[in-house]
Amino acid sequence: YQSGNAIGIHSYSHDYKKIYTSPQAYTGELLQTEQLIYDIIHVRPVISRAPGGTSGHFTPAFWKAINDIGYIEVGWNALTGDADGTGKTASKEVENLRRQLVIRPYLNTHLVILMHDAAGHEATVQALPDIIKLLKDQGYTFRVVTTAIPPSW
């Protein structure tokens, strides 16, 4: 964040059965995580990304609840396959993304890619330089996520 990156919240527990029981459960986790982040770096994030995405989890009440506490939800509209097992190698992840860019040309106006860098996702880290090159070669630019970002869907 000190170099200009955004800080967002994903959840505290990542427990779907817990966080999606109600809008209050979800926002409670956001606020719990927000406080933890604030205690460490003195920044209060207002951006979240729902574990597993909002589709199938969020109802209008969830959208209202996050809006009521001043958050925006930033979802993804493309993925490398590192979460579903289709991107087992760096080259496969790059190819998964390349294929999506071809079949979804509307992504050229607003692309948010689901990628993970935690343990077990070493292929994603290895794929990142090639993904950046692929996107730059196709004219994409990179920006920091802010509250002004339009929805990715």
What positions do the PLM features span?
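Catalytic domains of cell-wall/extracellular-matrix polysaccharide-remodeling enzymes
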Residues: 2, 8, 13-114, 118-136, ...
